[in-house]
Curated annotation (Swiss-Prot):
This is Insulin-like growth factor 1. The keyword Phosphoprotein does not apply. Residues 119-122 form a propeptide. It is found in: Secreted. Keywords: Disulfide bond, Growth factor, Secreted, Signal. Residues 90-110 are annotated as: A. Residues 78-89 are annotated as: C. Residues 111-118 are annotated as: D. It comes from the Eukaryota. It holds the Pfam family Insulin. Disulfide bonds join 54-96, 66-109, 95-100.
Length: 122
């Protein structure tokens, strides 16, 4: 013998199915495609580990971050620094062999040049 379900359960199932049919009818195939694409990129980026930047990708990232200022491959040192320095790590050590973020990339940007003031000509 079959199991008899209660009237409230049957009404809930019926209303829920009708609700889903209406929602699926309203949602076009392009909406479903974009939703699937968003879910796919979200899940793949959430599972991806830290990435490294090497070669042309590193140069492109530095050009993007630093813009017209330019950049250095080694951290700039101040004037009059001692000749007995500790070995420096460069951007390749920090971003190619290990992963780095935008703040780390910005540390290798050249400083902003002061704006040229207009001279008075006599």
């Amino acid at each position: 013998m079959g199991k008899i379900s209660s009237l409230p359960t049957q009404l809930f199932k019926c209303c829920f199915c009708d609700f889903l049919k209406v929602k699926m009818h309203i949602m076009s195939s392009s909406h479903l495609f974009y939703l699937a694409l968003c879910l796919l990129t979200f899940t793949s980026s959430a599972t991806a580990g830290p990435e490294t930047l090497c070669g042309a990708e590193l140069v492109d990232a530095l050009q993007f971050v630093c813009g017209d200022r330019g950049f250095y491959f080694n951290k700039p040192t101040g004037y009059g620094s001692s000749s007995r320095r500790a070995p420096q790590t460069g951007i390749v050590d920090e971003c190619c062999f290990r992963s780095c973020d935008l703040r780390r990339l910005e540390m290798y940007c050249a400083p902003l040049k002061p704006a040229k003031s207009a001279r008075s000509v006599r």
